[in-house]
């Protein structure tokens, strides 16, 4: 088995993945959302301190799963990029300690690659090559994945990410953090689902294959300010619905532009924000239009987790892509560094 560790942001997670068939044997996670909610976003120093508390607790649960028999573990895998430096280092320190004490090889794994492999948790075979949309609080990307070694970014956001824009709109409406599920719920409750959108679709007339949410976010801000004296529940529902609809339509329009160029046969949606059900439905329709197979990460593995890191690290294990302890470092700003 591979013991994998994820600590790139505000989720502490450990998992055990069986090497022979890619089955997830154990997966434990502690979310920090309640600790960061009062701040309206992730506080790096607080996240780091909580990882230092939570990772050892999760390791104890792993020990119980193993009946304290660590001989079943053949490698340690750790997310080392990208992410918050102060949280990545907490996971790396644990991984190094385990690698040294158990005399096991160390695998450094890319967080974004892990999200792609969330599509294949509990599955030995992948369906690569494929293209994928990764939407989260930190990223909005279109990726092309040929195999483990060859995953490249073909489109990214010029400013805010999809998930980040939901958090900021939620803050404008005084709804709480994290904003994604709250805004989605209000949008679902809005009574007039078929009325014309009140917000502009970003980059609608641009030929640039990219994402942008800053203009949409500013349009929401102006609408909130206009309604500030009477910002009741009905108005919050309306703004949430029109914002979410415009944001998803932007993803659809840009992805459709990509589809017309590349005509992918398989398309995946991954990342924490891919839990949004309206987004999933919109991409089902898009893929039907282009006769493209849609693959979705299971809802429980959309957010950051060690299970996806364990699944992706199986490929590295088979290829013996191990890293000496003295060369094992974090790289917070690196996105899908190419293999040499």
From Swiss-Prot:
GO terms for molecular function: iron ion binding; N(6)-L-threonylcarbamoyladenine synthase activity. Its cofactor is Fe(2+). It holds the Pfam family TsaD. It catalyses: L-threonylcarbamoyladenylate + adenosine(37) in tRNA = N(6)-L-threonylcarbamoyladenosine(37) in tRNA + AMP + H(+). Its EC number is 2.3.1.234. It is found in: Cytoplasm. Substrate binds at residues 134-138, 167, 180, 276. Binds 1 Fe(2+) ion per subunit. Required for the formation of a threonylcarbamoyl group on adenosine at position 37 (t(6)A37) in tRNAs that read codons beginning with adenine. Is involved in the transfer of the threonylcarbamoyl moiety of threonylcarbamoyl-AMP (TC-AMP) to the N6 group of A37, together with TsaE and TsaB. TsaD likely plays a direct catalytic role in this reaction. This is tRNA N6-adenosine threonylcarbamoyltransferase.
């Amino acid at each position: 088995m591979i013991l994998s560790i994820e600590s790139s942001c505000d989720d502490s997670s450990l998992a055990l993945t069986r090497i022979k068939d890619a089955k997830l044997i154990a997966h434990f996670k502690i979310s920090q959302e309640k600790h960061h909610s009062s701040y309206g976003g992730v506080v790096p120093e607080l996240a780091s301190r909580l990882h230092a508390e939570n990772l050892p607790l999760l390791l104890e649960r792993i020990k119980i799963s193993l009946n304290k028999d660590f001989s079943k573990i053949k490698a340690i895998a750790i997310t080392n990029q990208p992410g918050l430096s102060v949280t990545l280092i907490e996971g790396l320190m644990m991984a190094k300690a385990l690698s040294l004490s158990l005399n096991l090889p160390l695998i450094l794994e890319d967080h974004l690659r892990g999200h792609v492999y969330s599509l294949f948790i509990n599955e030995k075979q992948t369906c690569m090559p494929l293209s994928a949309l990764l939407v989260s609080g930190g990223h909005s990307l279109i990726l092309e994945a040929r195999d483990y070694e060859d995953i490249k970014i073909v489109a990214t956001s010029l400013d805010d990410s999809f998930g980040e824009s939901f958090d900021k709109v939620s803050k404008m409406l005084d709804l709480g953090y994290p904003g994604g599920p709250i805004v989605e719920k209000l949008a679902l409750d809005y009574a007039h689902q078929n009325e014309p959108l009140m917000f502009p679709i970003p980059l609608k007339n641009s030929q640039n294959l990219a994402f942008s949410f800053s203009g949409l976010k500013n349009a929401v801000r102006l609408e909130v300010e206009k309604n500030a004296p009477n910002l009741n529940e009905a108005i919050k529902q309306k703004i949430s619905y029109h914002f979410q609809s415009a944001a998803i339509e932007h993803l659809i329009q840009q992805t459709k532009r990509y589809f017309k160029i590349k005509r992918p046969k398989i398309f995946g949606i991954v990342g924490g924000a891919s839990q949004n059900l309206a987004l999933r439905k919109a991409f089902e329709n898009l893929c039907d239009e282009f006769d493209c197979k849609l693959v979705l990460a299971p809802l429980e593995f959309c957010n950051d987790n060690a299970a996806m890191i364990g699944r992706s690290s199986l490929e590295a294990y088979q290829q013996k892509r191990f890293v000496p302890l003295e060369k094992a470092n974090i790289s917070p700003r690196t996105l899908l560094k190419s293999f040499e």
